[in-house]
Amino acid sequence: MSLMKEMLSAGVHFGHKKAFWNPQMKEYIFGINHGVHIINLEKTVPLFQDAVNFVGKTVANGGKILFVGTKRQAQDIVEAEAKRCGMPFVSHRWLGGMLTNYKTVRQSIKRLAQLEKMREDGTLESLTKKEMLQNIRTIEKLEKVLGGIKEMGGLPDAIVVIDGNKEHIAIQEAQKLGIKVVAIVDTNSNPEGIDYIIPGNDDAVKSISFYMKKFADAVIDAQGLDRAVEAKADEAAQA
């Protein structure tokens, strides 16, 4: 199936009601159907291919991609696909400063690791019941917010965002730090400052699944390429 047909099947072309549009998205809109803007997939297809290729190249060069999707219908998909390709993710709440104040975030990640170790080795059980419950609640709270980035090990090389409007703080932080931004931008979104714009439906589960599967597949393919390059380098070193 062609990419265009896959997008049509996933409903990528359905935008928002005309009343909610952002005029900056005008060039990506094909028309209006029953008061809803229809996105021009002839524009989306090459832009999406560019974004997927960029993600693949970044990973092939040893880079990390941070997937961000905190809206209800994106949470499970973002988490599942990020885990499938071994990349960090934020799927519940974007903490202000998650990128721009990463030093502080890293301290919280260390705290989470310490508490998890205490739970595993039984240290928590030696505390009073009240202390143990407090620490368990802290683990749950930190895991929910930081669980997806606890193995990130530093700032990402790029972020992939499901909804440019919803995740505007994440985008602003990435821009401040010169981290490349890939974002799904619906007809109500502001495409300004986004490095790789993907005009498309950012609400439908089917559309979100389509994007995330393609990105995760690109990461997995690139990881194979990366390992092949490493293996060749090892062979050359041993020769």
From Swiss-Prot:
CDD domains: RPS2
Keywords, comma-separated and alphabetical: Ribonucleoprotein, Ribosomal protein
Organism superkingdom: Bacteria
GO cellular component: cytosolic small ribosomal subunit
PROSITE patterns in alphabetical order: RIBOSOMAL_S2_1 (PS00962)
Keyword Lipid metabolism: no
GO MF term set: structural constituent of ribosome
Pfam families: Ribosomal_S2
Single Gene Ontology BP annotation: translation
HAMAP family documented for this protein: Ribosomal_uS2_B (MF_00291_B)
Family the UniProt entry places it in: Belongs to the universal ribosomal protein uS2 family.
Name of the featured protein: Small ribosomal subunit protein uS2
Gene: rpsB
